[in-house]
């Protein structure tokens, strides 16, 4: 009876199969943990947003509330600095190699907060940055040269005209859809203004008319803008065609809201950038090897 205890203890020793199973389970858990960390790293390596708009606060607000900005939320200017200066958790931003982030200063001409100064942090490639910083004299001199004659080349000629004719129905459909979308948003914003912010007489007179005439108004506007965009994209050169084809809605909704005095109803805001002499001067003083993270227009 005394020798039975060690025999039982020897029978309880883990077999090699149990050890291999435990090692396999541990390996699976380790791989699962690595895959989870890999997924987290991929989430952290999300591409940086292409652009962000920072609204400049008034000097009176900044002078009256300095303590609140220190103890509470940070001002939007600091958020813009963090957007430019600090990378993600893994220390690397996922952005193209030939692009850089610059700060463009402009004024909102149409849309919400009209007349306010804004700082736009946007991604620009080297080519786009060179076009943006091109001096005015060069652009003015290049315009008459392009108008002298319809030159034929790889980027301009009859083949481009043929291509624009083929794309005419496609541009019409795309412009119709985009105009329908922005027009519906504009109509809804105008309806909310007359229904919630205006007087009772506006509510009983204008709101029913907006609802009744919505199908006619939206179809007329979308069809007209689609036809205009399809005709306007006919061009002799690729560059002019691309500029016209990318502008589907032609800024009609913003223009209409500004004419009606309802800038807040615009589905977008149009920002007019300041002169590009500052950024061209800053880049000319820098070495080509040196990277420019922030520039001012």
Curated annotation (Swiss-Prot):
As for membrane topology, the entry says: Multi-pass membrane protein
Q: What is this protein called?
A: Transmembrane protein 169
Spell out the GO cellular component terms annotated for this protein, sorted alphabetically and separated by semicolons.
membrane
Q: Name the source's superkingdom.
A: Eukaryota
Does the record bear Transmembrane in its keywords? yes
Keyword set for this entry? Membrane, Transmembrane, Transmembrane helix
Q: Where is this region: Disordered?
A: 1-88
Task: From the UniProt record, report the name of the gene that encodes this protein.
Answer: Tmem169
| Bias (Low complexity) ranges | 22-31
Q: Which organism is it from?
A: Mus musculus (Mouse)
């Amino acid at each position: 009876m005394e020798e039975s205890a060690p025999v039982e203890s020897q029978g309880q020793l883990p077999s090699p199969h149990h050890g291999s199973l435990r090692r396999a389970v541990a390996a699976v858990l380790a791989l699962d943990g690595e895959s989870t960390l890999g997924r987290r790293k991929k989430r952290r390596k999300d591409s940086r947003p292409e652009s962000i708009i920072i609204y400049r606060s008034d000097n009176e607000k900044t002078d009256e509330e300095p303590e609140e900005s220190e103890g509470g939320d940070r001002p939007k200017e600091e958020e813009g600095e963090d957007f430019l200066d600090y990378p993600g958790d893994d220390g690397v931003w996922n952005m193209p190699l030939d692009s850089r982030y610059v700060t463009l200063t402009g004024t909102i001409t149409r849309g919400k907060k009209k007349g306010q100064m804004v700082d736009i942090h946007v991604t620009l490639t080297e080519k786009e940055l060179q076009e943006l910083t091109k001096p005015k004299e060069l652009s003015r001199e290049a315009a008459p040269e392009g108008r002298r004659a319809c030159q034929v080349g790889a980027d301009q000629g009859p083949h481009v005209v043929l291509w624009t004719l083929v794309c005419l129905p496609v541009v019409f459909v795309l412009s119709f859809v985009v105009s329908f979308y922005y027009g519906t948003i504009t109509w809804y914003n105008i309806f909310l203004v007359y229904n919630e912010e205006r007087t009772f007489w506006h509510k009983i007179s204008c709101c029913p008319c907006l609802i009744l005439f919505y199908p006619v108004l939206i179809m007329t506007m979308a069809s007209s803008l689609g036809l205009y965009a399809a005709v306007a994209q006919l061009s002799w050169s690729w560059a002019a065609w691309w500029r016209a084809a990318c502008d589907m809605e032609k800024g009609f909704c913003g223009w209409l809201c500004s004419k009606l005095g309802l800038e807040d109803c615009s589905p977008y805001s149009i920002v007019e950038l300041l002169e590009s002499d500052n950024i061209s001067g800053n880049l000319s003083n820098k070495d080509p090897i040196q990277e420019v993270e922030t520039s001012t227009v």
